[in-house]
Amino acid sequence: MRFGGQRRCIESSDDNDSIDSMSIQQKNKEKEEWKWAQSLARRLEQVLNVHPEKYQNGCSSQRPSRQPSPVEQLAPIRSHSADFGRAAEMASGNSEEGKGMLLRNGDDRIRLPSPQRGTPDTSSTQGHPYTDQIVTINVSGMRFQTFESTLSRYPNSLLGDRNKRQHFFVSDTNEFFFDRHRTTSSSFTFEIRNYLFESILYIYQSGGRVKRPEIVPIDIFLKEMRFFQMGDDLLEEFWIAEGYEKPKEVMMPNNKTQRKIWELMEYPDSSLSARIIAFISIAVIALSIISFCWETVPSDIEEKPINNSATAELLDEMDEKHYSPFFWIELMCILWFTIELILRFISCPCKVTFATSVLNIIDFVAIAPFFVNFFFADTSKSNSSMSFAVLRVLRLVRVFRVFKLSRHSVGLQILGKTFRSSVQEFCLLIFFMAIALVLFASGMYFAEQGEPNSKFTSIPASFWFVLVTMTTVGYGDLVPLSPFGKVVGGMCAMIGVLTLALPVPIIVANFKHFYRQENRLASMKSKGDDADDDIA
């Protein structure tokens, strides 16, 4: 019995040993399969360039941290389309892997050859963009990197011209350093960004798209564009992007004397003498308008019927007016206007442009009636039947002198630009008013046709009532009497309000646009001159 039990114990122990050996073999097999799977996965990651930072130093057991190094935090490297930077874990030895640079775009990284220390390479920049030379730009401590071919898109700029940017090269750090304004912003991710230079660099990357960040003032952005010598075309693109057109280049006379006279008469802000002349011109215009209005105040003048005898008496009174103070005031004003117009015409750089200018035509029309009235008075006496109407028209033309103030008033010039840009809206308003005028005048005539005391005797006679009602003036000289006439009048008033309200916001928007543009032009001109002085 003892031997039998001992035999069974030995057999059971042998079975346990065989089971343990089988489990060990199975575990070893699983480990080998797992190692094979891991090696295959690592091989696939290397081929597919997934997490390349794990294989920089030939070690796959440790995965580098995603947190940037203190150097990266102090000097972040920025670019608009891709973020270039050196990895914190990149080896500093002589191995081939340690000599590379990482091109970071999101979470994927691609190893590129790092630029050599010392003088930058001046070899050709043609070829694939990922094999192009990388240029490092340091703007007040913030580093940017881009390809040299990107900067060469604008070869005349400061960054695009190698000779120009060579003056800012620092050989110790192998970068171009610019001590410029640094408009930065830190978001909730504690990411510091230089929006000002990013927008400058974006001009190179986008091929000429100028976009000013909202946090960057206009004068600072313009100063930076002038510093980096972006060119007139990009400056014009910037002006258009800001909502206004670049002012046209002013033609100036080549002759020195003509240039001085032209500046005195045409540009009041050019000198103190020009301001004095402009002030005298405004005073003479005001005096002429006051004299023109005060001359019509009745004193001992009696209304006379318009006939040949009245015309003859009017012509005789012209001789008596030579002794009137209004005549001498008019003569003095006309002499000033004439001298001013002649000096402008003599010194202008282009005679054709001067003759076709609206303001110059107004100046000529303002002085022409006086000379026609003065030199042809004797001739008018022989043909008195037509001279009376001509003289009245010439007197009426004198009122156009008020438009001479537009030469010295920016507000009147803005109003004129608004009217010119709103011609389509005015035509649309007149078209709607004409349709409503015919419809409601016809309705009012037929609605009031049965009333005995109605003043709406015809459709043209109803035009006045419809026009006054649609413009919400309502003189009250014409009033509908029938109930249907009152209904038509009420509908006419409501339609008139809607018709007038539709184009008015567009006209107001045009006025605001030109007003804001004029203010910006003045601000940009002053700040641009300051920027030129700073750059010089």
Swiss-Prot record:
GO annotation, biological process: action potential; potassium ion transmembrane transport; protein homooligomerization
Recorded topology in the membrane: Multi-pass membrane protein
Residues exposed to the Extracellular side: 297-322, 378-425, 480-486
Tissue: Expressed in a variety of interneurons and sensory neurons, as well as body wall muscle.
Disulfide-bond pairs as recorded: none
SUPFAM superfamilies given in the database record: POZ domain (SSF54695), Voltage-gated potassium channels (SSF81324)
Primary residence: membrane
GO cellular component, one term: membrane
Keywords, sorted A to Z: Ion channel, Ion transport, Membrane, Potassium, Potassium channel, Potassium transport, Transmembrane, Transmembrane helix, Transport, Voltage-gated channel
Cross-referenced Pfam families: BTB_2, Ion_trans
Function: Mediates the voltage-dependent potassium ion permeability of excitable membranes. Has an important role in repolarization and in regulating the pattern of action potential firing. Isoform a expresses currents in a more depolarized voltage range than isoform d.
Name assigned to this protein: Potassium voltage-gated channel protein shk-1
Higher taxonomy: Eukaryota, Metazoa, Ecdysozoa, Nematoda, Chromadorea
